[in-house]
Amino acid sequence: MSVDPMAYEAQFFGFTPQTCLLRIYVAFQDHLFEVMQAVEQVILKKLEDIPNCEITPVQTRKCTEKFLCFMKGRFDNLFGKMEQLILQSILCIPPNILLPEDKCQETNPFSEEKLELLQQEIKELQEKYKVELCTEQALLAELEEQKTVKAKLRETLTFFDELENIGRYQGTSNFRESLASLVQSCRKLQSIRDNVEKESRRLETQ
């Protein structure tokens, strides 16, 4: 059998020409074996009808096998020639013929050099895409950080607004005065707390 892959023919037919011929070869061999078995059975039956026949079934089987080997050898020789003819003249696509799906190659030929350049360009674009993706992730992380800082800043401003409102409530319109008043109040509260703790410890020791 031929060893040429014939990939273009396989693309067109949907099967390799060698596979087709191999199936024909196997089918003929199977048919030849079946025919020889049937012929052998007929010969044995005819020999049984002959009185005092000296030909035994074993001899008949040997003769049948020899004839089968002869027929198989002849067929292999003829099939080799037939295979070569079919592969070269029937199941073969001429070099100047393009399949419909490959017609674009005729109008837009693409060489190996162009393919290498295209692959290189694709590789460079993939690298650029990775860089852009990393940059985008970094920007998103920075944006989230800015959102967090903005939220904290808003809380701080709200806190200062509340301090200013407290100052107005206490009669001080200036923020510094309000802050000083608040610090003074905190110190008074801390002093009161310290006195309470001291008194509590004194009572516990008594």
Swiss-Prot record:
Q: Which domain of life is it from?
A: Eukaryota
Q: Does the keyword Transport apply?
A: no
Q: Where in the cell is it found?
A: Chromosome, Centromere, Kinetochore
- Where along the sequence do coiled-coil regions lie? 102-206
Q: Which Pfam families match?
A: Mis12
User: Among the record's GO biological process terms, what is one?
Assistant: cell division
| Principal location | nucleus
Q: Which InterPro entries match?
A: Centromere_Mis12
- Which keywords does this chain's UniProt record carry? Cell cycle, Cell division, Centromere, Chromosome, Chromosome partition, Coiled coil, Kinetochore, Mitosis
Name one cellular component (GO) term.
MIS12/MIND type complex
Concerning its family, UniProt says: Belongs to the mis12 family.
Described function: Part of the MIS12 complex which is required for normal chromosome alignment and segregation and for kinetochore formation during mitosis. Essential for proper kinetochore microtubule attachments.
Q: How does it assemble?
A: Component of the MIS12 complex composed of MIS12, DSN1, NSL1 and PMF1. Also interacts with KNL1, CBX3, CBX5, NDC80 and ZWINT.
Q: What is this protein called?
A: Protein MIS12 homolog
